[in-house]
Amino acid sequence: MKKEHIEPFFATLKAANPQPNTELEYTSVFELLTAVLLSAQATDVGVNKATRKLFPVANTPQQILDLGLEGLERYIQTIGLYRSKARHLMETCRILVDQHHSVVPRTREALEALPGVGRKTANVVLNVAFGEPTMAVDTHIFRVGNRTGLAPGKTPYEVEMKLMQRIPPEYLVDAHHWLILHGRYVCQARKPLCWQCAVSDYCSFKPKTAKP
């Protein structure tokens, strides 16, 4: 993607969706952290189905601890890797209660010290909950960054660094949502919907797919 195409690329995405947000359902920072932790290798739809049952019963660190490991597993067993996720969430809740007064920390260092929370999860929480200009590179953003030529890279971290450098500051806080949604619904993995893509003119992907 040419440098002069980056601004209109994001301006177009913004015009179509001025106030983007995550599709994970949450009402507090802790609920967001929990949902993101559960979302690894799972769909937002699947996570939402589980948390709609979990959160009315337990939506604080202490309430999760009170469920016990087996109790928590019963609520999230429809999600992939639920046993390890349950263990990580229980350990995270114990740290939040013991070290952070049950409050989700606002620093990357403290977030990444929580079990099951890596760089991507920390970036999501920092961006969505606290409005920090971070870029959580998931499979959708990795694909869009490479396919469009916006931020080609061999690793998620490399794509993240290029995106942080290339995205105009005024778009950075919301760029994470625009790129995820674009990858999820338009620039799809198996067959991108180029014929209905609003930013196709700015994209470096050559074999544009035609309308069926």
Predicted regions, residues:
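Catalytic cores of DNA base-excision repair glycosylases
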Residues: 2-212
